C-alpha cells in the first residue's frame, strides 16, 4: 500500500514538473540569472498568460544588459505587444551607444513602429550610403540631349526618420535638379566640360529638406550625348507642315474638280435652253408667214443665207483641219 501511494505521488510530481517546465521557460530563466538579469518566474508566467513569447523579450534584455543599456522588461514587452521588432530595436540601441549617437529606446521604438529599419538607419549614420541614380536625360538650349548618372552620398537623419521622405524622393529631386541644370546650359559642351557644375548647382538647392536623409555629396558618375532633339523636332515639324500643305492642295483640287463639274452641268443646261429656243423658231416663222409679217420671198432669202453660212463654216472647218495635219517646215 505504501509503495503504491509513493508511486502515485511520484507520478503526480513528475507530471506537475513537466507541466511547469512546458509552461515556464526554466532554461531561459536560468540563462537570465547567469547573465545577471533578475527576472522572476512570475514575470515569465505572466508573459505566457499575455501571449508574449518570453524568449523574444528576455533574450534581447540579456543582450542589452550585457551592453550596458538600462532597459526594463516592461519596455521590451510593450514594444513587442505593439507589433515591433524588439531584437532589432535593441541592436540599434547598442550600435548607437557604440557610435556615441543619442538614441533613446522610445525614439528607436517609434522609428521601428513607423516601418523604418532603425538598425540600418543607425548604421547609415555611421557609414553613409551611396545611392546611384539611373541615367537622367536633359536637353541643352542648342537642342542636344545629354544623359547624366549621379551618385548621391547620404547619411540617415535619425531625428527625421519618422515622417521624413525616403530614397525615392531624394532620387526624384536630384533628377529634377540635373534636368534643370542641363536645360539652362546654352551648349551641351558646357555640361561635358564641367560636369561638376551640375553637382554644385543641385547640391546648393537643399534637396534633403523634409527627407530622412542628409545629402553629403552629389557626384556625376557618367555623362553621355544622346541625340539632337532640336533637329528631330524640326524634322517632325517640317513633315507635319508638308502633310498640311498636301491636305490643303488636295482640298483645292477637289474644289476645282467640283467647280469644273458644276460648270459642265451649267453648259449642258444652257445648251438645252438653246435647243429649246431653236425648236421654237420654225413655229415663229410659220406664225410670221400666216400673219403676213414676212413674205415668202423673205423666207427663202433667209434660208439661202443660212445655207450659205453653213457652207462657209464647213469650208473653214476643213481648212483648219488640213492646216493642223500638214507637217511643220
UniProtKB/Swiss-Prot annotation:
Protein name according to UniProt: Flotillin-like protein FloA
Name of encoding gene: floA
Family, as annotated: Belongs to the flotillin-like FloA family.
Domain of life: Bacteria
Location in the cell: Cell membrane; Membrane raft
Record keyword Transmembrane helix present: yes
Main function: Found in functional membrane microdomains (FMM) that may be equivalent to eukaryotic membrane rafts. FMMs are highly dynamic and increase in number as cells age. Flotillins are thought to be important factors in membrane fluidity.
Assembly, per entry: Homooligomerizes.
Coarse class of the protein's main subcellular location: membrane
Membrane topology reported for the UniProt record: Multi-pass membrane protein
Keyword Transmembrane helix appears in the UniProt entry: yes
Organism expressing this protein natively: Staphylococcus aureus (strain N315)
Keywords linked to the UniProt accession: Cell membrane, Membrane, Transmembrane, Transmembrane helix
Gene Ontology CC: one annotated term: membrane raft
Sequence intervals crossing the membrane: 6-26, 27-47
Amino acid at each position: 500500500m505504501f509503495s503504491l501511494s509513493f508511486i502515485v505521488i511520484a507520478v503526480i510530481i513528475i507530471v506537475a514538473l513537466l507541466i511547469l517546465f512546458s509552461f515556464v521557460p526554466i532554461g531561459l530563466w536560468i540563462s537570465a540569472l547567469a547573465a545577471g538579469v533578475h527576472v522572476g518566474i512570475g514575470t515569465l508566467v505572466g508573459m505566457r498568460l499575455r501571449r508574449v513569447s518570453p524568449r523574444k523579450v528576455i533574450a534581447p534584455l540579456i543582450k542589452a544588459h550585457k551592453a550596458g543599456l538600462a532597459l526594463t522588461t516592461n519596455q521590451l514587452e510593450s514594444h513587442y505587444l505593439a507589433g515591433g521588432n524588439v531584437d532589432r530595436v535593441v541592436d540599434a540601441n547598442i550600435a548607437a551607444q557604440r557610435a556615441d549617437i543619442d538614441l533613446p529606446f522610445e525614439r528607436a521604438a517609434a522609428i521601428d513602429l513607423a516601418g523604418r529599419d532603425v538598425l540600418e538607419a543607425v548604421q547609415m549614420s555611421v557609414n553613409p550610403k551611396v545611392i546611384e541614380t539611373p541615367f537622367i536625360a536633359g536637353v541643352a538650349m542648342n537642342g542636344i540631349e545629354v544623359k547624366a548618372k549621379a551618385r548621391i552620398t547620404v547619411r540617415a537623419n535619425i531625428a527625421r526618420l519618422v515622417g521624413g521622405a525616403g530614397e525615392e524622393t531624394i532620387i526624384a529631386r536630384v533628377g529634377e535638379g540635373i534636368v534643370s541644370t542641363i536645360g539652362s546650359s546654352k551648349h551641351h559642351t558646357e555640361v561635358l566640360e564641367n560636369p561638376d557644375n551640375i553637382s554644385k548647382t543641385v547640391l546648393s538647392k537643399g534637396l534633403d529638406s523634409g527627407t530622412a536623409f542628409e545629402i553629403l555629396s552629389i557626384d556625376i558618375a557618367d555623362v553621355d550625348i544622346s541625340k539632337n532633339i532640336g533637329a528631330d523636332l524640326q524634322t517632325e515639324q517640317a513633315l507635319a507642315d508638308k502633310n498640311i500643305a498636301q491636305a490643303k492642295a488636295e482640298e483645292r483640287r477637289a474644289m476645282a474638280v467640283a467647280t469644273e463639274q458644276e460648270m459642265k452641268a451649267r453648259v449642258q443646261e444652257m445648251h438645252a435652253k438653246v435647243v429649246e429656243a431653236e425648236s421654237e423658231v420654225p413655229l415663229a416663222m410659220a406664225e410670221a408667214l400666216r400673219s403676213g409679217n414676212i413674205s415668202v420671198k423673205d423666207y427663202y432669202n433667209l434660208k439661202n443665207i443660212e445655207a450659205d453660212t453653213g457652207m462657209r463654216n464647213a469650208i473653214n472647218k476643213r481648212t483648219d483641219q488640213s492646216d493642223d495635219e500638214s507637217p511643220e517646215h
